[in-house]
Design a protein with these regions (language model features):
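Short His-Asn-centered micro-motif
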Residues: 6-10, 35-38, 80-82, 88, ...
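Long, compositionally biased intrinsically disordered regions
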Residues: 226-282
Length: 282
């Protein structure tokens, strides 16, 4: 499956993204990569951020960029936020994870299960969050949180995914809420999976996990095991995923990215209209 890895970053996040991009290549992942940044990166096809797309704090800009990318000739588009790091090449290809479904994000932790210990997600009480999902069309018995930093979309589903994500934004705003994009991403994984259990995070702990508690604080992941805590249940497990969402390693990733750019200064941006040929190596 022809796959494009893509991301968007600005400010210090572009240095984190530079560190991520190098880690992807260093472990031997060969999929094409496209970035949108406020200054060029090195070692990847780098386009300037689209000034027509508002980089809103709640990050619904991700859906606008997804819609923008649908003109590119790829089968699968994999979004990875800048504060990630690859410690080895994943055993499963991205195409193996998405399977036959049009969309994937890891459904991490149950919101309305006997295992649930946390009383809210994004400040919304669990019962109210479940009701919000139900009102939008989610009908699975158990509803799960997700992480908005890593997800995949097939090309034929991109326009519908973007439309649905932005529709959910408006839906929850009409309910008096101001939730970030990852709630919409969770909704998509519930609604558009033939078997949503194939999205459950526990099936992919060796591929990806989010380090949000600070056990790797200010350190770049190095392939060692670390203690993962599931957000809603607070259950812990020792993990060593190939891809770490290193949420508490930002300062180390910034410094790493700066050093990479000093050693290998970036070239100019690739104009968006030339991105396809640049990715093809023409």
């Amino acid at each position: 499956m022809k796959t494009l890895i893509w991301s968007v970053a600005w400010g210090d996040y572009r240095y984190m993204l530079q560190s991520l991009m190098k880690s992807i290549r260093d472990v031997g992942v060969e999929h094409d990569i496209l970035t949108f940044t406020d200054q060029p990166l090195t070692g990847v096809v780098s386009c300037k951020t689209d000034e027509r797309i508002e980089l809103d704090f709640k990050q619904y800009w991700k859906f606008h960029y997804l819609n923008k990318l649908k003109s590119l000739e790829y089968d699968l588009f994999v979004f990875i936020d800048s504060d990630h790091y690859f410690v080895r090449k994943p055993e499963k290809d991205f195409s193996d994870i998405v399977g036959d479904d049009p969309w994937h994000s890891f459904l991490e932790s149950p919101i309305n299960s006997p295992r649930t210990r946390r009383g809210d997600w994004w400040g919304v009480p669990n019962d109210a969050m479940v009701e919000l999902y139900r009102g939008f069309g989610v009908n699975q018995g158990t509803v799960y949180s997700t992480n908005g930093g890593f997800w995949m979309c097939r090309r034929e589903f991109m326009a519908h995914a973007a439309e649905t994500g932005l529709l959910f934004r408006d839906y929850q705003k009409n309910k008096g809420l101001d939730l970030p994009e990852e709630v919409a991403i969770s909704v998509l994984s519930h609604m558009f999976s033939m078997d949503y259990e194939s999205r459950f995070h526990y099936r992919y702990m060796d591929t990806w996990a989010s380090e949000w508690t600070g056990v790797l604080k200010d350190r770049i992941p190095d392939g060692s095991f670390w203690d993962f805590q599931e957000y809603m249940t607070m259950e812990t497990k020792s993990v060593n995923p190939a891809i770490v969402h290193a949420m508490r390693s930002k300062s180390a990733l910034v410094e790493s990215g700066k050093q990479i750019m000093v050693k290998n200064p970036p070239s100019d941006f690739v104009a968006w209209e030339n991105a396809s040929s640049a990715l093809a190596g023409v």
